[in-house]
Amino acid sequence: MTTLSDSALDQLFLSARTHNAWQDKPVDDALLHRLIDLTKFGPTSANASPARFVFVKSPEAKARLKPALSEGNLAKTMAAPVTVIVGMDMAFHEHLPRLFPHADARSWFAGNDALIETTAFRNSSLQGAYLILAARALGLDAGPMSGFDGAKVDAAFFAGTAIRSNFLVNLGYGDPAGLFPRSPRFDFDDIARIE
């Protein structure tokens, strides 16, 4: 495997920002399909792939999402071309015979609600992070958020299923005029050590 170019690293990490304001420019559905085609290849435990994604685009879908949003996230989410609900399928293990066929991985989870919860949350969070990086790689900007009422989102979008919401990500083409100055980040010695 080779190292990415400095310009690619810059696009994915160094110059990429969390956007709160959006250009009035639509995101094509074909690009969202491509986004999932990249995201799905990020690693998860036993290839469990518990994340489920709802791309909220239409005015009707936005209206269903709106009552679940915290006040601070309302305007920017309504203005975003797309809001992704990153959900987690609490019955993900039912798909393991297909996704992880070389072991009886379903039996590791069946009846173990605590392990299901931990695995679904951890791995759907990973998949949401892959989605953010894939979006940046495809020229989109992202604004992840956790300020929302999960029960309301679940009732509006996942009723009658085993899927629960994890977090939200606004997607589109960011308006740089809406950016705050970049906040500080930790240095290596503040957060890491080598043993």
Curated annotation (Swiss-Prot):
| A Pfam family recorded for this sequence | Nitroreductase
Q: Which InterPro entries match?
A: Nitroreductase, Nitroreductase-like, Nitroreductase_HadB/RutE, RutE-like
Write down the EC number. Answer: 1.-.-.-
Q: Which GO terms describe its molecular function?
A: oxidoreductase activity
- Cofactor(s) in the UniProt record: FMN
Keywords, A to Z, come to: Flavoprotein, FMN, NAD, NADP, Oxidoreductase
Which Gene3D superfamilies does UniProt cross-reference here?
A: NADH Oxidase
**Enzyme class, broadest EC rank:** oxidoreductase
Organism superkingdom = Bacteria
> Member of which family?
Belongs to the nitroreductase family. HadB/RutE subfamily.
According to UniProt, the name of this protein is Putative NADH dehydrogenase/NAD(P)H nitroreductase Bcep18194_B1060
Q: Per the UniProt entry, what species is this protein from, by scientific name?
A: Burkholderia lata (strain ATCC 17760 / DSM 23089 / LMG 22485 / NCIMB 9086 / R18194 / 383)
Q: What is the lineage of its organism?
A: Bacteria, Pseudomonadati, Pseudomonadota, Betaproteobacteria, Burkholderiales
